[in-house]
């Protein structure tokens, strides 16, 4: 597949499930998918692991959405810089609803095989989310 085709696949995977279209996950993720994210205790495994993660966040942020801001592709890899937004109106990681609007940035590197995403490394501003929820204090300026 071309770099542009790979970017389209990854963009769809990053954006559509957050709009409620979980069916796209089965179309775009390989059954042997592994998703690495330091904010999670274990890697995500397969389409079901990906869907469960999205569902958990959508339960906490009913209007959750991700927008892909920029992508760079080379060979079988796509790097995507994205922004996630949503109103915290459900439980998340033991944190009850705060009603606060949250905006976070993240970066995902996706590896594709045969037109499907088989592995991803994601790093996003979990700490910033916790600050916006008033769970941890803002850092003092130097």
Features from the language model and the residues they span:
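C-terminal and inter-domain tail/linker signature
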Residues: 1-142
């Amino acid at each position: 597949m071309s770099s542009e085709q790979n970017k389209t696949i990854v963009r769809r995977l990053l954006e559509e499930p957050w709009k409620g279209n979980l069916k796209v996950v089965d179309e775009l993720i390989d059954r042997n998918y592994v998703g690495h994210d330091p904010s999670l205790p274990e890697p995500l495994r397969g389409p079901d692991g990906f869907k469960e993660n999205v569902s958990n966040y959508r339960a906490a942020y009913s209007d959750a959405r991700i927008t892909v801001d920029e992508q760079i592709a080379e060979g079988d890899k796509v790097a995507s810089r994205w922004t996630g937004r949503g109103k915290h109106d459900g439980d998340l990681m033991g944190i009850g609803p705060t009603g606060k609007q949250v905006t976070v940035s993240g970066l995902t590197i996706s590896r594709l095989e045969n037109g499907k995403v088989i592995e991803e490394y994601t790093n996003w501003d979990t700490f910033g989310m916790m600050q916006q929820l008033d769970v941890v204090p803002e850092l003092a300026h130097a």
